[in-house]
Swiss-Prot record:
Assembly: Heterodimer of AddA and AddB/RexB.
Enzyme Commission number(s) of this protein: 3.1.-.-, 5.6.2.4
Sites where the protein binds ATP: 47-54
Domain UvrD-like helicase ATP-binding residues, every copy: 26-487
Organism: Streptococcus thermophilus (strain CNRZ 1066)
The UniProt record lists the keyword Hydrolase: yes
Catalytic activity from the UniProt record: Couples ATP hydrolysis with the unwinding of duplex DNA by translocating in the 3'-5' direction; ATP + H2O = ADP + phosphate + H(+)
GO biological process: double-strand break repair via homologous recombination
Protein name: ATP-dependent helicase/nuclease subunit A
Family of the protein in this entry: Belongs to the helicase family. AddA subfamily.
Names of the cofactor(s): Mg(2+)
Location of the UvrD-like helicase C-terminal domain: 515-799
Length: 1217
């Protein structure tokens, strides 16, 4: 076996010196070398943005392999499946290269072995690993290895609801029913359902599942805050803090003011109250026996109304400003005093009710524990689990079975984890159990921890960072701060912002020289003044923005969009390609507005994984309502939608004239009355409306008759043909997408009827059930332009880099500051547990005749949790801004909206430790306000960005401009036109036509669909299950008129069984076959009985071969992953003709495929006769490649394994293509 010693610290230092002395263009940094070669201890690599952490990981793995460590001796956890695939691909390429350079047979054999093992090595997500572990050792917990992962949210919700309903009824009728009703009412209020209480239970359950031991957390932490809460003690602490804090500051303020006011406002009446307040405060601060509550009430009485307000009217401008400043500060102090008074009242009430709250929450704790247990039992019974269940099973296996844990610890030379800052406590516990205590390698950057919503806890990284920093014996801390991605203008702006914003208080890390970004190469340091970071703010009147438009989900304004479009057009005119520009949005709510505006200006824009609702797309909704109206014209909503649609164009005036034809009844009856002029007001049915009604009633009647004896597929195409609807949407924005959606509707109707279900009513019922359940059908993948501006969320951009970056909606309010941010009835915290708002009945405390006097009180735990949650939320927003800013390579734009007058005068120049004060950073609600506060408090040269307000006058259509789309042929080019006589002009035209015909011959031969009729002619054979249909350019467009042929009826003749019929029957059987752990001959026979084929055809289907298929490796894989199986899946995609560069349509039906985490397994049944499998492998190579390409595009997954299942030979064969 290949073995080489690892480098010692001295050898690592020597290598660092050698690298520094080398003449390489791009040298490894000393920290990178340390990260690659250090060994023998736990290592934490804090890698700043663009510092090459993936490169370091790959090099470290290769170095270990080069020293004899097998790839199967490494545990490598990645954050996503995609990251794992990319890492495997890099390793395979590098190892293959090393294999070619190997000098000995032993080294070659070892490297070949490692390449072969990459596919099965433990490189992947923690979810994938825990599934593998539970598959192997689940029997120790009684878990069957054939378990299924429940990924469908609807399925999870259904099972949860069933368990919850039974448990809820038990508690409502149990011994603590009265207390339980009080508990439920505390969260549901006057609601007639228990949904709010159910949501609380589900939230607590979900939160507990992100901990390493859910049951332990529920028992020990859920009520920890409430148990430790001492309202009386909190009240005393609040009063004690008044003396040295608020009251002392108020006294100093009043003293300072009185000295000036007695001179400038000597006769002002309010000064007597100021003097009294000073006397009160001086006496109380000296006397330790002062009743602080009484003092507070006296001060509030003195300040009531205009008691302490300066009401004078000085003429001097300086005195006027001084007066206003005094009143403003005084009001702030009084507001704080009132807030303290309110808190004291709440604490007093909480003290009286504290003994009532805990028993109620203990009952809640019991309910959640019972729910967790019963929900798990329900999943065990169905042998289907969530990812969190599998993770906890894995932890239990390793904790309760030391021999299993030891086997893993002995196997792994090193336990590596990428994106360590986004680890959850469950994942951290798994890593601890797999490690031997000194062989962990962790890579991450706390400044990029942005996944709290997935229960990631950046404190895990932070604790390790502090531990290794303070105690090197515990582990080695390596900082990678050199950035190899961005130009100095981007790095300087990022450092300028975060060195004044981020610290341990907000951001969870002190952004000092240790963490500042440093240019990794000389080229990055070259100055480019034109690329200085710009803060672009659309100057708008804040009064025009309502509160409802503000918040984390607020829409982007048209002014911001216009501003961005103008800058992009400007960049484009300077030679910047669209594909080098990226827009980063806080969420996907802005996508549609941006797409529409960009399309209007001719700028191609590709949103990343933008998922619009297929069933809610306008063209599909209109077609569904058309089908509903055909099925039942008495459906008023569907009928009116069809009338208003572009197919018939009835306007509101038309509908009103129809509606008045009867006082009551269905709209269809009124429509018929209007058509026959037999309604209440026939005189209002004018000639134009009469023509519309005639067309509509005749068309609808024709469609209804047609639907009775034709398939839904044919009906849909008839609608497209009759009313030219397919052509109509082809002229709208996003035409290709709309037409693809309509085409897919016909395909799905056909696929639905092929399952054996017939009839328009059933199809509509199926669609309505999908809509009612909140689910959707996948939207058809659109053609994506190559040179286009990209649009994605900040979260999605993490780990990526782009030349020019626009960060949008800098004025969006943070969740913690928004109206609905933290205003719920409960907040859950990992340490303190559940904090609630308590519904207290104060009838006994207040003299009232009311039967009840309910008041909602925030418990101490709720207040504590809200403070922590708010601070944690703001810290993550700060890190999210860091991620956004560090994506740019060349230039960064920060785009927002606001009033110039307000933003430039809102903040002062106060600074603490070269940063904005903590209180101000905590109070600020948007990225934009952070930037503007920095701009006010610090010198512009320290910040390295410029702020520019853009006015409406700068955003006129003329000022914005338009992207010039160059035509392929300039029709107005008359340079070679002889222009003298008519004959010469005619010859010129003919010559031009001939040239164009020759130039575009391939495109002319390639059919282009011009009408729905022609389109249908091409699409008719789409459901052929044995192949892929391509609009072949050799076929051309068939003429509409074809010669009619009539064949004599085949009376009494014996039907000949064709191979195609047997093939179709075989495909249908495999589609109808119900899969379980094993497949028997009886299962196949039952499935065959349901096949819609003649008995002669069924007799030719070879069931023994099909049964044998499930004993093959592929058959076993399908049975083991049947929940990931897709059968008879229709597809349609656009491909480019290599000769003409024009698009043509490829479409077909895929027999089946498995959608696994790391790959797709595609398979196709073939009943063709063959003597050697290679014949069919060659024949269907192209077809399978097209299938694979379609699946790869649809699921964004590169690896597709392709198999042919050959049934036409002597024996069954499974061939990999």
């Amino acid at each position: 076996m290949l073995t080489k010693a690892f480098l010692s610290p001295a050898e690592i230092e020597e290598r660092i010196a050698q690298e520094a002395a080398s003449d390489k263009d791009r040298k490894l940094t000393p920290e990178q070398i340390e990260a690659i070669y250090s060994n023998g201890t736990n290592i934490l690599v804090s890698a700043s943005a663009g510092s090459g952490k993936t490169f370091v990981m790959v090099e470290r793995i290769l170095d270990m392999i080069g020293r004899g460590v097998g790839i199967d001796q490494l545990f490598i956890s990645t954050f996503t499946v995609k990251a794992a695939g990319e890492l495997k691909e890099r390793l395979e390429k590098r190892l293959t290269k090393h294999l070619g350079q190997a000098e000995t047979d032993e080294e070659r054999a070892f490297l070949s072995d490692q390449i072969a093992k990459i596919g099965t090595a433990d490189i992947g997500t923690m979810d994938a690993f825990t599934q593998k572990l539970v598959n192997q050792y689940g029997y120790l917990l009684g878990v069957s290895p054939t378990f299924r992962i429940m990924t469908d949210l609807a399925e999870q919700t259904l099972m949860k609801n069933e368990v919850y309903a039974d448990l809820f009824n038990d508690y409502m009728q149990g011994k603590d029913a009265q207390l339980f009703q009080k508990l439920v009412r505390n969260f549901t209020g006057h609601s007639k359902t228990s949904k709010a209480f159910r949501d609380l239970v589900y939230d607590i359950y979900s939160f507990s599942q992100a901990t390493a031991d859910p049951e332990k957390w529920l028992c020990q932490n859920l009520l920890k805050g409430q148990i430790e809460a001492k309202p009386e003690q909190a009240k005393n602490e609040l009063l004690d803090g008044l003396k040295d804090g608020l009251l002392a500051d108020f006294l100093a303020f009043l003293r300072d003011h009185l000295g000036i006011a007695q001179r400038e406002f000597a006769k002002a009446k309010y000064l007597n109250n100021v003097s009294d307040a000073i006397i009160l405060l001086e006496g109380s601060l000296i006397n330790d026996q002062t009743d602080m509550e009484d003092l507070l009430k006296q001060l509030l009485t003195l300040s009531g109304g205009t008691g302490l307000t300066n009401m004078t009217r000085p003429k001097d401008e300086e005195l006027k400003a001084y007066k206003e400043a005094y009143n403003k500060t005084k009001n702030e102090f009084v507001a704080q005093l009132r807030e303290v008074d309110t808190q004291l009242t709440v604490l007093e009430v909480l003290t009286k009710h504290n003994d009532d709250i805990l028993p109620m929450l203990e009952l809640l704790q019991s309910f959640v524990l019972d729910f967790s247990d019963q929900y798990l039992q329900a999943k065990i019974q169905e042998n289907t689990f969530e990812f969190s269940d599998i993770a906890h099973f894995a932890i239990r296996i390793l904790e309760e079975n030391p021999e299993v844990a030891v086997s893993y610890r002995d196997r792994y030379h090193e336990v590596m984890v990428d994106e360590y800052q986004d680890n959850s406590h469950t994942q951290e516990r798994m890593l601890e159990l797999l490690s031997n205590g000194h062989n962990r390698f962790m890579v991450g950057d706390i400044k990029q921890s942005i996944y709290r919503f997935r229960q990631a806890d950046p404190q895990i990284f932070n604790d390790k960072f502090q531990l290794f920093l303070e105690n090197p014996d515990a582990g080695k801390l390596i900082l990678l701060k050199e950035n190899f991605r961005s130009q100095s203008e981007v790095l300087d702006a990022t450092n300028g912002v975060f060195s004044h914003l981020m610290d341990q208080e907000i951001g969870d890390i002190l952004y000092d020289k240790t963490h500042m970004l440093v240019a990794g190469s000389q080229k990055q340091k070259e100055p480019h003044p034109e690329n200085e970071t710009e803060v672009l703010i659309y100057n708008s009147d804040e009064s025009s923005t309502s509160e409802d438009e503000e918040g984390p989900d607020q829409a982007i304004s048209s002014g911001e969009i216009s501003l961005v479009i103008k800058e992009i057009i400007k960049l484009h005119e300077q030679g910047v390609r669209f594909e080098d520009i990226t827009l980063l949005a806080p969420n996907r709510n802005t996508y549609l507005d941006l797409m529409v505006s960009f399309e209007e200006h001719g700028i191609p824009l590709v949103p990343d994984e933008y998922k619009s609702s297929y069933l809610e797309s306008l063209e599909v909704m209109i077609m569904l309502d058309t089908l509903r109206a055909i099925n039942n014209p008495l459906n008023d909503y569907a009928l009116v939608a069809l009338l208003r649609s572009p197919m018939f164009n009835f306007n509101e005036d038309d509908l009103t004239r129809i509606a008045v034809q009867a006082d009551k009844g269905q709209f269809y009856d009124k429509l018929l009355a209007a058509h026959t002029k037999s309604g209440l007001h026939p005189e209002v049915v004018m000639q134009g409306l009469e023509a519309k009604l005639t067309l509509f009633t005749e068309t609808l009647a024709d469609w209804r008759d047609y639907s009775k004896c034709h398939s839904i597929y044919d009906l849909i195409w008839k609608i497209y043909n009759d009313r030219f609807y397919y052509d109509y949407v082809g002229g709208l924005p996003r035409a290709e997408q709309r037409q693809a959606n309509l085409y897919a509707l016909a395909l799905r109707a056909n696929a639905y009827e092929k399952t054996g279900f017939k009839g328009l009513s059933r199809f509509i019922g199926m669609i309505d059930k999908i809509i009612a359940s909140g689910n959707d059908l996948e939207e058809v993948t659109d053609l994506v332009p190559k040179n286009a501006v990209s649009l994605m969320t900040i979260h999605k951009s993490k780990g990526l880099e782009f030349k020019y970056v626009f960060v949008l909606q800098m004025n969006r309010k943070f969740i913690g500051h928004s109206k609905d941010g933290l205003s719920g009835k409960y907040i859950i915290n990992r340490e303190k547990g559940l904090g609630i708002k308590y519904l207290a009945d104060l009838k006994d405390q207040i003299n009232t005749n009311l039967p009840k006097l309910n008041v909602v009180l925030e418990t101490l735990t709720f207040q504590d949790n809200r403070r922590e949650e708010r601070r944690a939320s703001i810290s993550e927003e700060m890190r999210l801004l860091y991620v956004a800013m560090t994506r740019a390579e060349k230039k960064l734009y920060l785009v927002g909206k606001g009033s110039k007058e307000t933003l430039t005068q809102q903040y002062g120049t106060d600074v603490e430790n070269n940063r904005l004060p903590v209180a101000l950073r905590d109070q600020i609600a948007t990225y934009q306000d952070w930037i503007m506060a920095l701009d006010t408090a610090f010198m512009r040269k320290d910040l390295k960005f410029t702020v520019r307000f853009v006015e409406d006058e700068e955003l006129t259509p003329e000022a914005i401009g338009q992207v010039e789309v160059k035509a392929a042929v300039d029709a107005d080019d008359l340079s070679n036109n002889r222009q003298t006589e008519e004959i010469e002009r005619a010859l010129t035209v003919l010559e031009s036509v001939e040239k164009l015909n020759h130039l575009y011959a391939p495109a002319i031969d390639l059919p282009s669909v011009r009408t729905p009729s022609q389109l249908k002619t091409f699409y008719e054979p789409i459901m052929d299950t044995e192949g892929v249909d391509i609009m072949d350019k050799k076929e051309g467009v068939q003429p509409l008129e074809t010669a009619s042929t009539f064949e004599l009826p085949d009376f009494g003749q014996k039907t000949k069984v064709t191979g195609a019929a047997v093939g179709s029957a075989t495909h249908e059987l495999m589609q109808r076959l119900t899969l379980s752990d094993t497949v028997t001959l009886q299962d196949l026979t039952q499935a065959l009985s349901r096949v819609s084929a003649s008995d002669q055809v069924k007799a030719r289907v070879q069931l023994e071969k099909l049964l044998g298929f499930f004993d093959t490796e592929l058959g076993k894989l399908i049975l083991a992953n049947r929940d990931k199986l897709r059968r008879e899946a229709p597809f349609a995609m656009l491909a480019e003709d290599p000769a003409s560069k024009e698009d043509f349509v490829v479409r077909g039906i895929i027999d089946g495929y498995l959608l696994l985490e790391d790959r797709i397994v595609l398979f196709d049944y073939k009943t063709d006769h063959f003597t050697h499998p290679s014949e069919l492998k060659t024949r269907y190579q192209g077809q399978m490649s097209l299938y694979a390409k379609a699946l790869s595009q649809a699921y964004q997954m590169e690896k597709v394994d392709k198999y042919l299942i050959l049934l036409g030979g002597k024996d069954l064969e499974v061939v990999e293509v």
